[in-house]
Amino acid sequence: MLEPWHASVRKRQRQAPKFWWFDPGVARALAGTLTVDIVPRSTGFGRAFEHFVILEIVRAADYARSDFRFSYLRTKDDAEIDLIVERPGRPPVLVEIKSTERVEPRHVRDLERFLPDFPGALPLCLSRDPLRRRIGDVLALPWQEGLAEMGL
């Protein structure tokens, strides 16, 4: 479960959490979509990839026995940060997850929009793109390398 992020605990409690199953296959089974192929570049593939990456980050943090807190942020106009990783004594990590094989500036616009609200935060775009590069203030890199950037 990912709690919604807000600086105010009271406002955080009024927003709905996101639920993630321990295995993306369980979610597909419950949705009755196990026999439906997940095709790259589809909405279903993007959702499954985001689910998978979030689970890998949470599992790595659990394995490392870190005290990281995980949340997400969605505004009333549906701008979203897929994952906010709060690390004790260190700046937070703002994570955008994209299933694309080529990250483009349009993929990180929402993330860049939130940066003034999180001074000092580490903005990452994790994807299937094999190249590591900067896009504006955002570090775009393969999802596996993102775990190391977070300290996992």
PLM regions: where:
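Switch/connector loops and helix/strand junctions flanking conserved nucleotide-binding motifs
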Residues: A29, E104-P105, R132-G136
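Accessory nucleic acid-recognition modules appended to NTPase machines
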Residues: M1-P91
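Active-site ExK catalytic segment of metal-dependent nucleases
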Residues: V93-R102
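Short beta-strand/turn micro-motifs composed of small residues
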Residues: R74, C125-S127
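Domain-level recognition of nuclease-like catalytic cores that cleave nucleotide substrates
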Residues: R128-L152
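Conserved beta-strand segments of alpha/beta enzyme cores
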Residues: R69, L122, D137-L139
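Short, surface-exposed loop/helix-turn segments at secondary-structure junctions
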Residues: V36-R41, I97, H107-L111
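Short, charged, amphipathic alpha-helix that recurs within catalytic cores of restriction-modification
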Residues: T100, R106-P119, P123
